[in-house]
Amino acid sequence: MQTDNTKSNTNKTAKQEWGSFAFVICIALLIRILIMEPFTVPTGSMKATILENDYIFSTKYSYGYSNYSLSFFDFIPLFKGRIFAREPDRGDIVVFRPPNDMSVRYIKRLIGLPGDKIQLIDDVIYINDKKIERTEVGTYISEEGIKYLKFKETLPNGRTYFSYKLAPIYGVIYNDRYGNTDVFYVPEGKYFFLGDNRDQSNDSRVNLGFVPFENFIAKAQFIWFSTKITWWDNDIGVINLVLKLKPWVESVRLNRIFRNLYNTDA
């Protein structure tokens, strides 16, 4: 027979367990809101720096905080501007809300700072009338078998990275209008972004336009996981999930796990 003391101890233990669980959940939420957040990349606009289904670790504190960088609360107009703001560096890979569609998140490379004059001529970036250093270093063949020319680019601050351009097919250059643009004057408080996959990126050259600093969410740091296919498609049931588990495991890109996004040794 259970005594009143036994019941009291059981209830006390249950409350302690729920309290501990709630504490852990609160800490996890605070970490995601203020410190770091994982992102999944659905498109190839940053290929081959970032591939489709790469899982990115990003730091929320790198640029301070705005309404858009606070996970779970970004739909509530809590405040305007940024608090604890830190200026981004040219060449950063940034996760942000595009000003023309606040329902999605983009990830691109920051090229132009406020006050900059930006233009692309024959695929070469000119910043304030000075062309950046750009050297062809080889080719890249995508998982779909598409050939890209690979270039190493160096920005005025010394930061280097790789960009990619579709290789000409029978002498025909793809999407040449992306490589020869109008002049862009970056307004105060806004930034100019490009995708590393220069011929297949919706960036500041076309529909995206300039991105306000307020729209920045986080700075991308490294790839913590990567897979060629998505296992948890919304339109498949439990049986299909089980059947798809083996090919999903086999599709994991082991060579991309924990890859630093700013490493240009490869």
Swiss-Prot record:
Gene Ontology terms describing biological process: signal peptide processing
Superkingdom, taxonomy of origin: Bacteria
EC identifiers of the protein: 3.4.21.89
Keyword Membrane: yes
Protein topology in the membrane: Single-pass type II membrane protein
Reaction catalyzed: Cleavage of hydrophobic, N-terminal signal or leader sequences from secreted and periplasmic proteins
UniProt topological domain (Periplasmic) ranges: 42-266
Ranges facing Cytoplasmic side: 1-20
Pfam annotation, one family: Peptidase_S26
Matching InterPro entries: LexA/Signal_pep-like_sf (IPR036286), Pept_S26A_signal_pept_1 (IPR000223), Pept_S26A_signal_pept_1_CS (IPR019758), Pept_S26A_signal_pept_1_Lys-AS (IPR019757), Peptidase_S26 (IPR019533)
Catalytic residue list: 45, 108
Role summary: Complements E.coli mutants temperature-sensitive for LepB function.
Homology family: Belongs to the peptidase S26 family.
Name assigned to this protein: Signal peptidase I
Natural source organism: Rickettsia rickettsii (strain Sheila Smith)
Gene: lepB
